[in-house]
Amino acid sequence: SSKSEKENIMQNTCLILLSYMECVTPDMAQDLAETADYIIAADGGQNRAREFGLQPDCVIGDFDSTTLDEDFDCIYITYPAEKDLTDTEAALTHALEKSCRNVILLGGMGGRLDHTMGNIGLLDKYYSSFDHMEFIDGKNRMELLKDSGRSLKRDARYKYFGLVSLNAEASGIDIRGAKYELTGASLERASTLGVSNEFKEDTVEICVQDGILLIVRSADR
């Protein structure tokens, strides 16, 4: 195969290191890095890279919250501090330019609530840009599901999973393989019906016919 084909295959999965991470251990970060073909450190994420002994392929940001040391052997991309997009979105834009298909964002939950809510918005904005996109840390994982189905494989780190509608109402919701199963159900945005579910089987099947669901997996702590 050609060099360009190899590069495309190589950059299939992207790991984005964010500055704020909850309960992320070096082992967890290194395991995710091993499955990634391209690693982006978003601004303060370069400090996490140093902390975990990871080598990013690119460091991107406005460097308002961290100094630009340029001590990694990689590409550095600087944005003006008064830019219209966050460092997280700048990293996602770069992942798109690199033709990455799967994106794991390490961190970005907890901490400042406005940032967490903004990151849920990014899951929505970039939903069709990538084959898969998910925020992960030591406490939670979050991803979106729109008008389609998904299989969740049991992950021992996260005992619970919950569904939250991002529409006024999501309908045609099926859940199989879980402690609490649903068939053709509707979920309103204000409803707590979808929270605190658990795996019964090794795989849970979730389907929504009409609407957007935020899928959150949470650790038991």
For the regions a language model picked out, list residue spans one by one:
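Short, Lys/Arg-enriched N-terminal segments with co-localized hydrophobic residues
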Residues: S1-I9
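Short, well-ordered alpha-helix to beta-strand connector turns
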Residues: A36, P56, D73-C74, C100, ...
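N-terminal beta-strand-loop-alpha-helix module at the start
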Residues: M10-E70
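Short phosphate-binding loop-to-helix
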Residues: Y76-K98
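Short Gly/Thr/Asp-enriched flexible loops that form oxyanion-binding sites at enzyme active sites
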Residues: D114-D124
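Short, acidic/small-residue loops that bind anionic groups at enzyme active sites
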Residues: Y127-R141
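Long, charged alpha-helical interface segments
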Residues: N140, L145-R221
